């Protein structure tokens, strides 16, 4: 537990920042929720019971969950039937016998992208696709048409602390967010041997995003898409809205293409020279994310 999240949590924060830079409308909604929940309070004034639950039920929690859905740290989880007895699984009313010592590989990335278990709509990223199951859409986690609970301060995380040495027994999401069927959302595995540090990881993720987005915005760097190599900032400053939107669209397309190359070496991450350059800017000084995709 001392080093919990050193690799996995850091990767999820990284992926979440890139996704939010690639999807400015989601980032703006997240910042509105952060402002509503935290006001002007400094991090040292935040309270675990009220602040964490409110963040979990907001666009912050939805963004964390959506990142975990699309980019789970561990894409494949090994399981094994007890060596002492067979096990019977009841799936959709049918019983399936698993012989003792059977090795099972649970493919997290597949079940979490199965449209059978998730709210979907036609893709805004690729209009030719009937489903946005492959897209980063945090709003799918809200049960009321893309809006969070009316009072974020009174949000609950049902079962959040029902954790013992036998494994966390509660759900992975806020009581106010969409609840996929058991087994459809398993970034922390499931059952008696699920991740003991899941609640710690969730708090770390929520806090990291809240600290960043209360003061800053994340934008995709567009340097590689500005013609010429000199005076890039000056060229961008001289562009009109239509040109800026086209420039940022190129960065968005590149970001999605690079993110699709993520692969596993112990955990899921970008490797070799694959990376998505971003800019950290103070809120109010954005060039793109304050208005790009306003119709989303």
State what each model feature region is.
Residues 271-296:
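C-terminal helix/juxtamembrane-tail motif
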Residues 106-175:
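Conserved cytochrome P450 K-helix/beta-meander segment immediately N-terminal to the heme-binding cysteine loop
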Residues 22-74, 99-102, 132, 225-246, ...:
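Cytochrome P450 I-helix active-site segment
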Residues 1-33, 67, 103-105, 205:
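Central I-helix of cytochrome P450 enzymes
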Residues 2, 92-94, 184:
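Short, conserved secondary-structure segments in the cores of folded domains
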């Amino acid at each position: 537990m001392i080093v919990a999240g050193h690799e996995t949590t850091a990767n999820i924060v990284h992926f979440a920042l890139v996704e939010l830079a690639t999807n400015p409308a989601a980032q703006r909604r997240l910042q509105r929720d952060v402002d509503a929940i935290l006001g002007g309070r400094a991090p040292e004034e935040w309270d675990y019971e009220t602040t964490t639950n409110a963040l979990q039920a907001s666009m912050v929690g939805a963004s964390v969950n959506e990142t975990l859905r699309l980019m789970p740290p561990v894409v494949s989880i090994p399981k094994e039937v007890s060596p002492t007895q067979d096990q019977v699984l009841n799936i959709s009313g049918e019983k399936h016998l698993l012989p003792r010592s059977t090795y099972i590989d649970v493919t997290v990335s597949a079940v979490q992208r199965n449209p059978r278990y998730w709210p979907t709509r036609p893709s805004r990223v690729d209009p030719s696709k009937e489903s946005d199951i492959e897209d980063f859409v945090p709003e799918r986690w809200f049960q009321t048409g893309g809006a969070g609970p009316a009072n974020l301060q009174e949000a609950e995380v049902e079962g959040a602390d029902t954790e013992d040495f036998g494994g966390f027994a509660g759900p992975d999401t806020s009581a106010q967010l969409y609840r996929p069927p058991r087994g459809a959302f398993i970034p922390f595995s499931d059952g008696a041997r699920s991740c003991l540090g899941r609640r710690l990881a969730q708090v770390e993720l929520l806090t990291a995003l809240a600290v960043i987005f209360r003061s800053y915005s994340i934008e995709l760097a567009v340097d590689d898409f500005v013609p010429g190599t000199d005076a890039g900032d000056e060229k961008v400053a001289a562009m009109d809205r239509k040109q800026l939107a086209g420039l940022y669209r190129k960065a968005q397309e590149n970001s999605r293409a690079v993110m699709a190359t993520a692969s596993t070496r112990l955990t899921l991450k970008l490797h070799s020279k694959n990376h998505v350059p971003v800019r950290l800017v103070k809120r109010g000084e954005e060039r793109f994310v304050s208005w790009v995709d306003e119709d989303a």
